[in-house]
């Protein structure tokens, strides 16, 4: 097992990062926030130029790694478009993208988009989105569903995993922004980065981020290798680790930015706000933990260190 992306996948991610920056970078989100119905027009041409929608992550290992890399790059720039969900689309449904939902309260960050969307629950129950309901912050919207079948177990793991790569990209950016901030900002005649307490806080955040980085690579391998049930468990474990890490990383980054970190003039504010749908849907920390625990029972996760 090689727990790293291929050189080609990493290069694809780097090119995507540059393309998103050239297309407007942080301003893409600002513009989409003001006019959600422009999300596709702002982003899809860039994705088309990169050939993102030509990837086949469900059937090709190289495409799977490239898809993860581009999702991470999309997260870095908080790209106002559901790249991961588009790439997770199932082969056997007439849908442009796939979202994992909580059947009790299906929702997703799809405001302003007119694509054909499908949803799947952890039990493999698939539906199509009949219409978008009430909207909330950060493009979140309730979904009105039309049932299709219960044959979607093989679709779940990838649809859980790729959004975690998007969230990982957001954590990358939050750490980079905060490192730059404390290296520039001075207090008592010296930069904030020179204070030991600040160094400890940043180290705590980086440990969380790097842990998600490693687990995301393992889960990507699991999605492409293991049976559906094991892959779903690994994907849920990744999701739990990612949203727990996000709480630590964004808390530390906001603390070190101070009050300015909550102002729209700073990128961290936008990044933090638009990470919320990824962290809350389909489940937040508590329910993700409960679901994973109930699925595993006394068996534990299957992995490198299982007995």
Pin down the residues of each PLM region.
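FAD-binding core of flavoproteins
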Residues: 76-176, 180, 299, 303-307
